[in-house]
Swiss-Prot record:
InterPro entries: aa-tRNA-synth_Ia (IPR002300), Anticodon_Ile_ABEc (IPR033709), Ile-tRNA-ligase (IPR002301), Ile-tRNA-ligase_type2 (IPR023586), M/V/L/I-tRNA-synth_anticd-bd (IPR013155), Rossmann-like_a/b/a_fold (IPR014729), tRNAsynth_Ia_anticodon-bd (IPR009080), Val/Leu/Ile-tRNA-synth_edit (IPR009008). It comes from Deinococcus radiodurans (strain ATCC 13939 / DSM 20539 / JCM 16871 / CCUG 27074 / LMG 4051 / NBRC 15346 / NCIMB 9279 / VKM B-1422 / R1). GO terms for biological process: isoleucyl-tRNA aminoacylation. This is Isoleucine--tRNA ligase. It is found in: Cytoplasm.
Length: 1078
């Protein structure tokens, strides 16, 4: 015989202690290390860890990401794969630099660092990245995220930097690296270029009120081109006086740097007479401009012509003195080769008449499109604002660019140039690290020509499985569609130095390795720190010219996007032959799976994709999960200033890391925003973790009492129907969880698991409870073996989701000193599947569920027996199943009789009314017709459609309304003395009339529940027999006397007496009871 006992478990577990014990076992047994060294028959499953920056503390959103990162590697390991879980740290970039600048008091200073300052600055950066490393390690371990932190890749290490250099040289060899002049976003306080990714995040943009001004630029008649002269020839002398171009802008601070005015050559333009003077505008803007002067007559059109007729027309700039002050020209309206140098009209297809005046103010130093136009016309740039955002000209000189608007507007008003001034609410980007408004600024920098491979990046994107799927052609696809060249240079200190050495004549040498640089420099540099300022000291001579490194460092997104290669220190020589890291790289490229927050579509996901496409013509990853952001329960972003930040570790201590992980998987689809509250974590714990634990503790308690011989259990085919049903459901669950996880659908997998555990607890154990009580000295080995197997398999299925709980269950249930995470993933045993059996049981459970809902809705206590219930099934097959399970239905619904209805019945009457919050605005004046249509509709048919979640149509007065389930409210009414409901084709209708006998039985059942609670309060074991004394009166006494045998059997009372007694006394409805253990 194979009898065994299980370690006793508490009914109320301390999950914090349980998880601590499991963590210790993992350490003692080196469980994670075993997954890295044991044979992997299914081969390598490649996972990339997106590198966090360790100089900030981990937060709740890191728990979300790490839960999803951990889930699928655990699953794949159990399927027989090897998963290398190499950790990584992103150690360069602005987050690190800004934290050090704050310590040094550098933030906002507008001059560079000396060599000594730079050396100290980078030393502090190197150490600061590890300030919170212990917090990260503690979080990683505490939540059960398995990661190799003993040998992580670190982006500041020489091997990583050198590998990144190697990639850049390869891209240069492909003709994809170039130096160019472009308008880039800057954070003024740090005067450094920002990437598109850093501005692509939702939080980078804020709704702000900015100026909206229309400014007059008087045209210069003396130099008017012939074509423009002809276009304006119909104007009288008086009408020509003060004629101006009218430009519109929301950035008055750029007006001192104005160099051009742009019009669309194909649009119609007019001279319009207005209260503020005669102006040239697009004809499509006339009505909009007329509305600006509310009390004035509409603008009068005096002449009409095409935009192309205005080319080369000169105008008076809004700030005439600036061009000469900045040294761009020596005098106003300077001409070269017969053409104006500045301040004339140019042609631009991007100008429209949809907003503004149809005449665009151009300040090419601060606008990408403006810069392209200036290049086309050979116009020099004017920098009225420097790269720290400080105005350099006008009486507003020295002010921050956004602060200068008010004074500039007042000055132009005083000089009669202001046509109209107001405000406009729109989105504007801010730097999330400094809080500064972004300054778009033309500057020379280094770029990767990603625009040349834009089509290939789109093609490679088609090969990637995105979760959620709409990201592929939505957020990520749109980002690829809008691809611009990648600005990779940063005017900063702490970062991967660009490996670009230039000669005095501009010749470029891109270095691909330390060995190459050593050879050129004529000395061994293998021990050199490759960061500034040391790398800046390295020069070499070629063909008689000295080469020095350019001062910029690399965009950190290129750093992190290089991790598939640089984590192994991959190096190729100039012939493309492997020098280092090729074997590991080939084994771990591309990734099978990556996961980060949705903002990484414009960050890490993009940099991985771009680099991989350019170098290898394939995606860097096959499957990717994009996670929505976590906000507080009000939908607000979590921040220290709002006081709504939730620290992860106290949350783990209170609810257990498993409960928090389960919440992360189940709260919403992965790409959706998650509104977090502790209440929802508590609910996740209650609904799944506690439910599973309760079944587990129930099994252990009774198995230790009965000590069943599990090996002696009958074959599955010979077990009772309830056991065969549970094992069939178990196989369905194995199938469904496996399929979901294979599809990277954690939530569906969790739902399948949660549904099974609910069935296990609230149906199988509930219906089989008496089989575990060992009445008459018999032990139901079939029941024990069935429940034991179900729990054992569930412990394996839940292992990737809730790794601590799973291991605790498995170790005790299996009797093995081995982790569940080292066991093979369950496979479906097809012979146990039984669609008919599970469908039949589902029909019974549906009726019971519907019946319980009716009881709850009508305040009919579950323990109060009712005379009968009428039941209608959704199909003939379901009806047969219900009839076979009549006894179960009676017991579950606590009724004396069941009547089965066949065919339709009018027992429940329905009426319909519009759901006004949903359809009110949509139908407006048609609401009376809609109400009539609902009154005349087949209410039962509509109710059926609504219950099924299907749309439907109703008609009245020749109007058809196509409605959704949420468009109507369905009111149900049953006859007097009947409580009923319908759903999905099922009907349950209770007879609510109560006889004295039924009332007494209900009271007896309530008394049983009260005595059971008293047993628990007294600390009795479930098997303890008791003597029971009942001090009752009235109806309670009558009920106890009538149902004495039933009460005694339920509460294990071998002696029942009336009156006072000795022992544990408890108050109950109708009196008191006293319990004494025998």
């Amino acid at each position: 015989m194979t009898k065994r006992t299980f370690a006793p478990v508490p009914t109320q577990p301390n999950f914090r202690q349980l998880e601590a014990d499991i963590l210790q076992k993992w350490k003692d047994e080196q469980v994670f290390e075993q997954t890295q060294t044991r044979p992997a028959p299914a081969g390598e499953f490649v996972f990339y860890e997106g590198p966090p920056t360790a100089n900030g503390k981990p937060a709740l959103h890191h728990v979300l990401a790490r839960s999803f990162k951990d889930l699928f590697p655990r699953f794949k390991v159990m399927q027989g794969h090897h998963v290398t879980r190499k950790g990584g740290w992103d150690t360069h970039g602005l987050p690190v630099e800004i934290s050090v600048e704050k310590k040094l008091g550098w933030l906002g200073r507008n001059h560079g660092a000396s060599r000594e300052e730079l050396e100290e600055f980078n030393r502090l950066c190197r150490t600061s990245v590890w300030e919170t490393i212990q917090d990260w390690n503690e979080l990683t371990e505490r939540m059960g995220y398995w990661l190799d932190l003993g040998d992580p890749y670190i982006t500041y290490q020489n091997s990583y930097v050198e590998s990144v250099w190697n990639l850049l040289r390869r891209l240069h060899e492909k003709g994809l690296v170039a130096q160019d002049y472009k308008v880039v976003p800057l954070s003024p306080r740090i005067s450094s270029t920002l990437s598109r990714a850093e501005l692509g995040e939702v939080d980078s943009y804020r709704m702000v009120d900015d100026p909206s001004v229309y400014v007059r630029l008087p045209i210069v008649w003396d130099t008017l081109p012939e074509r423009a002269h002809a276009a304006l020839s119909s104007l009288s002398g008086e009408q020509r006086q003060g004629l101006s171009l009218l430009v519109w802008t929301t950035t008055p601070w750029t007006l001192p740097s104005n160099t051009l005015a742009a019009v669309n050559p194909d649009l119609d333009y007019v001279v319009a007479d207005s209260p503020s003077g005669r102006v040239i505008v697009a004809e499509g803007a006339v009505e909009r401009l007329s509305a600006l002067h509310k009390d004035a007559a509409p603008l009068e059109v005096l002449a009409r012509f095409k935009g192309r007729d205005l080319e080369w027309v000169e105008y008076e700039p809004p700030f005439p003195e600036v061009a000469s002050q900045l040294g761009v020209v020596s005098e106003l309206h300077e001409r070269r080769d017969g053409k104006p140098v500045l301040h004339f009209v140019v042609m631009a297809d991007f100008v429209s008449d949809v907003d503004g005046s149809g005449v665009a103010h151009e300040a090419p130093a601060y606008g990408a499109e403006d810069l392209e136009v200036a290049r086309a016309y050979g116009v020099p740039l004017m920098f009225g604002v420097d790269d720290h955002g400080i105005l350099q000209v006008t009486h507003e000189q020295g002010k921050f660019f956004k602060d200068a608007d008010k004074g500039l507007i007042a000055d132009m008003k005083a000089r009669g140039l202001m046509f109209w001034a107001g405000t406009l609410k729109h989105r504007y980007p801010f730097h999330d690290r400094t809080g500064d408004p972004i300054l778009y600024f033309a500057k020379k920098g280094w770029y990767i020509r990603t625009s040349q491979v834009a089509g290939e990046m789109l093609a490679q994107n088609e090969k990637i499985n995105w979760v959620p799927g709409n990201i592929k052609h939505g957020r990520f696809g749109n980002w690829l569609e809008g691809n611009v060249d990648w600005a990779i240079s940063r005017e900063r200190y702490w970062g991967t130095p660009l490996p670009f050495w230039q000669s005095e004549s501009g010749q470029l040498r891109v270095i691909g390795s330390v060995a190459e640089l050593s050879e050129l420099a004529g000395r061994d540099l293998s021990d050199l720190d490759l960061h500034r300022p040391y790398i800046d000291d390295i020069t070499f001579t070629l063909d008689g010219e000295e080469y020095r490194r350019v001062p910029e460092v690399l965009d950190v997104w290129f750093d992190s996007g290089s991790m598939p290669y640089a984590q192994w220190g991959l190096l190729l020589n100039e012939q493309g032959e492997a020098v280092r890291g090729a074997e590991q790289f080939a084994k771990h490229y591309p990734a099978d799976y990556i996961c980060e927050a949705i903002d990484q579509t414009r960050g890490w996901f993009y940099s991985l994709h771009a680099i991989s496409t350019m170098l290898y013509d394939q995606p860097a990853y096959k499957n990717v999960i994009c996670l929505g952001h976590i906000v507080d329960e009000k939908g607000l972003k979590m921040s220290k200033s709002k006081g709504n930040v939730v620290a992860p570790l106290p949350l783990f201590d209170q609810y257990g890391a498993d409960s928090v992980r389960w919440y992360m998987f189940m709260a919403s689809d992965p790409g959706d925003q998650k509104r977090f509250s502790e209440r929802l974590v508590a609910e996740a714990q209650r609904s799944y973790v506690n439910t599973l634990w309760n079944v587990y503790s129930f099994f252990v308690l009774y198995a230790n009492l009965d000590q069943p011989d599990l090996a002696a259990a009958p074959a599955v085919a010979e077990r009772p129907e309830m056991d065969r049903w549970l094992l069939a459901r178990l196989e369905e669950t194995v199938r469904d969880v496996t399929a979901a996880l294979e599809s990277y659908d954690a939530r569906s997998g969790g739902r399948a698991l949660e549904g099974f555990v609910d069935d296990l607890s609230n149906w199988y154990v509930r219906r089989s409870r008496s089989r575990f009580w060992g009445e008459g000295g018999t032990v139901d080995t079939a029941a024990y073996a069935t429940l034991h197997e179900a729990l054992l398999v569930v412990s394996q299925l839940t292992a990737p989701f809730t790794p601590f709980l799973a291991d605790a269950l498995y170790r005790n249930l299996s009797g093995e000193e081995s982790s569940v995470h080292l066991t093979p993933w369950p496979t479906v045993r097809a012979e146990r599947l039984d669609r008919k059996l599970t469908a039949d049981m589902a029909a019974v459970m549906k009726v019971v569920e519907l019946g319980r809902a009716v009881r709850g809705a009508h305040n009919l206590k579950t323990r109060q027996p009712l005379a009968g219930v009428q039941v209608r099934a959704a199909s003939p097959e379901a009806l047969d199943a219900l009839k076979r399970s009549q006894t179960q239905i009676m017991e579950e619904l606590n009724v004396k009789a069941v009547t089965f209805l066949e065919g339709d019945t009018d027992l429940v009457q329905y009426s319909l009314r519009p759901n006004l919050p949903v359809v009110g605005k949509q139908y407006g004046k048609q609401l009376p017709v809609l109400k009539k249509a609902l009154t005349e509709a087949d209410a039962r048919a509509v109710a059926t459609a609504v219950q099924a979640g299907q749309g439907f149509s109703v008609q009245a007065d020749g109007v058809t309304f196509d409605l959704t389930p949420g468009s109507v409210l369905v009111d149900a009414k049953a006859p007097e003395g009947v409580a009923a409901a319908e759903d999905a084709g099922y009907l349950v209708a209770f007879d609510t009339a109560l006889t004295p006998e039924l009332v007494r039985e209900g009271l007896a059942r309530d008394l049983v529940r009260a005595i059971q609670e008293a047993r628990k309060a007294a600390g009795f074991e479930v098997q303890d027999r008791i003597a029971l004394a009942l001090e009752l009166d009235g109806e309670a006494l009558e009920a106890a006397q009538a149902w004495q045998d039933f009460i005694a059997g339920e509460v294990l009372a071998e002696q029942v007496a009336y009156g006072s007694g000795e022992g544990f006394r408890a108050e109950v409805e109708g009196g008191a009871v006293t319990l004494k253990k025998l």
